[in-house]
Amino acid sequence: MERIKELRNLMSQSRTREILTKTTVDHMAIIKKYTSGRQEKNPALRMKWMMAMKYPITADKRITEMIPERNEQGQTLWSKMNDAGSDRVMVSPLAVTWWNRNGPVTSTVHYPKIYKTYFEKVERLKHGTFGPVHFRNQVKIRRRVDINPGHADLSAKEAQDVIMEVVFPNEVGARILTSESQLTTTKEKKEELQGCKISPLMVAYMLERELVRKTRFLPVAGGTSSVYIEVLHLTQGTCWEQMYTPGGEARNDDVDQSLIIAARNIVRRATVSADPLASLLEMCHSTQIGGIRMVNILRQNPTEEQAVDICKAAMGLRISSSFSFGGFTFKRTSGSSVKREEEVLTGNLQTLKIRVHEGYEEFTMVGRRATAILRKATRRLIQLIVSGRDEQSIAEAIIVAMVFSQEDCMIKAVRGDLNFVNRANQRLNPMHQLLRHFQKDAKALFQNWGIESIDNVMGMIGILPDMTPSTEMSMRGVRISKMGVDEYSSAEKIVPLHQSKVECSSPH
């Protein structure tokens, strides 16, 4: 306060005001700051005062032959004075307007080819349908998603070589185009762009969009294929969603889908062969998707799906160690465990042989309508934070986490016999038996779990065994979060094939 009074006092003296408004800035440090280096220190200000000048643009002398000195209104378009320090002409912004209206029109045949991804986007939006807007709490999970529809799947390095070859064919520098996709793309693009007048740099940028998959880690609720991600800002907010059906597919989404289907078929066939690993690798090498060898696609494609991960692991590529259980994708974010067989008794005195995970671990659980963070120790749930669209979705997540925790009170809550079978009439493994049992009726599980009083934490509330929210009590270790829970993004160690096969059929 004292400082402000002092400043006010100074400003009221006319001499101060004069010094501040009239004195030139000639302090060396300030001049250095604003004049050293090529980088503009205050671009907005520079633009403002440049545009306030009569001739802020400089152009090649040839412009004087192509543009009249004055426009129809008699305004001067360029100055007869040369630009200081170069032999260029000083030009008015009005010259740009004149050129846009009256300048020569070049052939537009290359535009749809260069700006292909934009033209395709416009078509998808034109033919897409936007449905009603619903207001509800959105559960968004950050996921790695593909943000530019319609691209090929070249690595950044491969694409760079293709772009250099297409756009700057005469530049020096070793470029080795080896893969089929590189060669076909180069040939195709060279033919398309013959006689193209668009600036090479722009062409290079556009080709990059077309050739390389760009991914971002974005909060998403709903469709994650690139044709949904391009309209993310239109389809979901914090408390609303708008239904949307894309007006067309993009080839990269088709490739992702085909890759998943192919990988599943290959894994299924490899499992029953005499040498699963060898046969899986052989099939990956001999399969083509959209004319590109599957092994090449696997190297570039970040799709995370069990069968795809198995194929990647077999090839020795890095994968993220996630697995599915009860319709949720579990991703371990910290901790570790060892597996050990253990026999346990259910509430019906039936003996189950389960694989117990010994050790402290933290997981993110990601499902269609709910997400959660789970912290567990050996056969003990320490903490579960759930976020979901509705009561039903939250209950599903809690059941899966309780079964996954392998706690004794969960196993003792079993009433009746466990005899669930799959579609091929084979008995399910014990963990899935337990899951099915409680998915049918979780009442005993929730009642048996135990409750505790809770502290008031912002954004968190408790949940009682009958699924009603509470601010005082909650099932032991379980809390409901009003915000979404992020999927963890990282590529962990390579899982050997035989291990990942077990991992993917079931986490236990």
From Swiss-Prot:
<dbReference type="InterPro" id="IPR049106">
    <property type="entry name" value="Flu_PB2_N"/>
</dbReference>
<dbReference type="InterPro" id="IPR048298">
    <property type="entry name" value="Flu_PB2_CAP-bd"/>
</dbReference>
<dbReference type="InterPro" id="IPR049110">
    <property type="entry name" value="Flu_PB2_2nd"/>
</dbReference>
<comment type="function">
    <text>May participate in the inhibition of type I interferon induction through inhibition of the host mitochondrial antiviral signaling protein MAVS. The knockout of PB2-S1 has no detectable effects on laboratory infected mice.</text>
</comment>
<keyword id="KW-1045">Host mitochondrion</keyword>
<dbReference type="Pfam" id="PF20947">
    <property type="entry name" value="Flu_PB2_1st"/>
</dbReference>
<dbReference type="Pfam" id="PF20948">
    <property type="entry name" value="Flu_PB2_2nd"/>
</dbReference>
<dbReference type="Pfam" id="PF20950">
    <property type="entry name" value="Flu_PB2_4th"/>
</dbReference>
<protein>
    <recommendedName>
        <fullName>PB2-S1</fullName>
    </recommendedName>
</protein>
<dbReference type="Pfam" id="PF00604">
    <property type="entry name" value="Flu_PB2_5th"/>
</dbReference>
<keyword id="KW-1035">Host cytoplasm</keyword>
<dbReference type="InterPro" id="IPR049111">
    <property type="entry name" value="Flu_PB2_middle"/>
</dbReference>
<dbReference type="InterPro" id="IPR049113">
    <property type="entry name" value="PB2_helical"/>
</dbReference>
<dbReference type="Pfam" id="PF20949">
    <property type="entry name" value="Flu_PB2_3rd"/>
</dbReference>
<dbReference type="GO" id="GO:0044164">
    <property type="term" value="C:host cell cytosol"/>
</dbReference>
<dbReference type="GO" id="GO:0033650">
    <property type="term" value="C:host cell mitochondrion"/>
</dbReference>
